[in-house]
Amino acid sequence: MAEMGLKTYRFSVSWARIYPEGRGEVNPKGIEFYENIIDECLKYGIEPMVTIYHWDLPQALVDLYGGWESEEIIEDYVNYAKTLFKAYGSKVKYWITFNEQNIFTSLGWLTAQHPPGKFDDQKTFVRPYKPLRWRLTAPQF
């Protein structure tokens, strides 16, 4: 990438790699995995740009309380984001809190092409509220 002249590398962190159960104990190997990516980028003068959530909600949270269907998701997301900021905040300048929020909700609830695979046009327009709250909450840390 450096030989190609790239100045920035955008990648997404897998929530389940950091928190295998979606919450609870942090997976140190998951933290190390992304730290290695970040360190390699910086070593070659490439600025890491980290996407916190890219459509990969841990199945454990869906099973536990319905994932996006529950307000509990907000607290778990904030905890996940804080974990990333603490682990990588001194090395990462650019963060994307949520990847394509409008696509995630429409494919999940309007067309049922992505999880949760439900066709509910009313919820399609309500679901963006929660990721919007995430966006407004995460930068506070």
Question: Which positions does each model-derived feature cover?
Answer:
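Active-site region of glycoside hydrolase catalytic domains
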Residues: E21-G22, E35-F141
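Catalytic domains of carbohydrate-active enzymes, especially glycoside hydrolases
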Residues: M1-S14, E47
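Glycine-rich, proline-tolerant flexible connector loops at the mouths of alpha/beta enzymes
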Residues: V13-V26
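General structural concept
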Residues: R10-F11, W15, G30-N36
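Short alpha-helix boundary/capping motifs
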Residues: K29-G30, E69
